């Protein structure tokens, strides 16, 4: 505290007290930001730990998922512009001629004014892709072929499990691929 010069000032004690309060508020704001970043890191760690044991590159399975929430990010040009890409697991929605990114919410919905969308509950055909994203279409074909008699929807969901945040070599990336089976009512 002596180094800060706060107490060595010759100004009135009220001025020194005001500066001390301002410094305390600034430190508190920095602490809150650090805690927010730490929470984001812990969220990613938890998602990877929860997901990695289920990775099976050889087999495809049918899985029931509850409704899930995500924050839409947009296309590839918008991907790095906002915080959501960095703070939440990345999900990519592949349409026939589109590719939209989102941030999967794995815990409480954020308080900030983020737009929240829903991935519907349902039964999904699930497989995994290992490697660079440039080759993911091969895994899409393999999984669609496996589920060809299951009335699959057109949109393919790809959730990055092991990505550039934890692995430098893109040959080691791991992506969970989900294709929803259409409801037949």
Descriptions of predicted regions:
Residues 8-14, 18-185:
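A solvent-exposed interaction/effector surface
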């Amino acid at each position: 505290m002596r180094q800060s010069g706060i107490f060595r000032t010759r100004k009135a004690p009220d001025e020194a007290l005001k500066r001390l309060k301002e410094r305390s508020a600034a430190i508190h704001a920095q602490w809150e930001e650090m805690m927010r970043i730490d929470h984001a890191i812990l969220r990613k760690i938890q998602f990877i730990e929860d997901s990695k044991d289920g990775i099976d590159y050889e087999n495809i399975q049918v899985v029931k998922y509850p409704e899930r929430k995500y924050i839409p990010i947009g296309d590839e040009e918008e991907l790095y512009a906002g915080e959501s890409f960095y703070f939440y697991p990345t999900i990519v929605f592949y349409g026939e001629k589109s590719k939209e990114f989102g941030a999967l919410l794995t815990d409480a919905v954020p308080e900030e004014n983020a737009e929240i969308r829903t991935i519907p509950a349902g039964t999904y055909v699930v497989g995994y892709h290992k490697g660079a994203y440039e080759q993911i279409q091969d895994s899409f074909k393999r999984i669609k072929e496996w589920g060809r008699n299951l009335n699959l929807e057109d949109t393919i969901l790809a959730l990055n499990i092991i990505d550039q945040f934890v692995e430098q070599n893109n040959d080691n990336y791991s992506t969970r691929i989900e294709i929803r089976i259409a409801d037949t009512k």
